[in-house]
A protein has these predicted regions:
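N-terminal auxiliary segments of SAM/dcSAM-dependent transferases
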Residues: 1-23
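A short SAM/SAH-binding and catalytic strip from SAM-dependent methyltransferases
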Residues: 127-141
Length: 243
């Protein structure tokens, strides 16, 4: 890992990013799902439904949902009968997820505080590994990908949905203006936290483009990697297999 890593548009020490990202999500946890609805116009729900259809959870198979915090993806996969472990480095996000599960009468999920770079699971523990809008916040992405590969069984599936760079002509300017100007102001007005949402917008710009991230997934040992662009590439679903 390099001596510095990105935190939005800043370059900082790796340990500092872990701490500062933790602070961001501790601040936004209570309003995280509401802000997702507001900022995406509810579209994130459709993206997540599409993502889970790609994962194709099977009854009783073991799935690790990393950075799964508030449970949005886990609830969808559990509804299809999968045995889901929700892992997140941030306890406040997990607490929100546990509360949401109780309110919905959803049980059977395992909730665990985990660092994606150093998972506390034996090798070959899971049939599938999912991470949605989380990997760009990881300090050492190659380490997290290596851990995902390690904990998957042979034949296991890796699926990641993350923001990316749009390829639609003219849309990039609109998207940039929205994320840099509107998102932080929404954070200020709704969550009383402009700076956290400024970081979240900036972190999208610093995340590797689709081809580069796909190459990183391959370098971690995954085969048959694919990328599915959504909304002209503003969002992408990455997948790979452990063979």
């Amino acid at each position: 890992m390099n001596d510095t890593v990105s935190f939005g548009y800043q370059d900082i020490a790796p340990h500092e990013k872990t701490e500062r990202v933790g602070e961001v999500f501790s601040k936004v946890a209570a309003k995280y799902d509401l802000m997702n609805d507001v900022m995406s116009g509810g579209m994130h729900r459709l993206w997540k439904d599409r993502f889970v259809r790609r994962v194709k959870p099977q009854p009783d198979e073991a799935i690790l949902d990393m950075a799964g915090g508030t449970g949005d993806i886990a609830f969808r996969m559990a509804a299809r009968g999968a045995s889901v472990t929700v892992a997140d480095i941030n306890q406040e996000m997990l607490d929100v997820g546990v509360e949401r599960a109780m309110e919905r009468g959803i049980d059977g999920l395992v909730w665990s505080r985990q660092n994606a770079e150093t998972l506390e699971y034996p090798a070959r523990s899971f049939n599938a590994y999912t991470i949605v809008f989380g990997i760009r916040n990881v300090t050492d992405i190659p380490a997290a990908l290596a851990e995902a590969h390690r904990v998957l069984k042979h034949g296991g599936r890796f699926f990641c949905m993350e923001f990316s760079t749009t390829t639609w002509p003219g849309f990039k300017d609109v998207y940039d203006a929205y994320s840099h100007r509107v998102m932080p102001q929404m954070g200020r007005l709704i969550a009383q936290d402009e700076e956290s949402y400024r970081y979240l917008a900036e972190s999208i710009r610093r995340f590797p483009p689709m081809p580069q991230f796909e190459a990183m997934i391959s370098e971690a040992g995954f085969a048959n990697t694919k990328v599915e662009a959504i909304v002209g590439g503003a969002v992408a679903i990455h997948s790979g297999w452990k063979v």
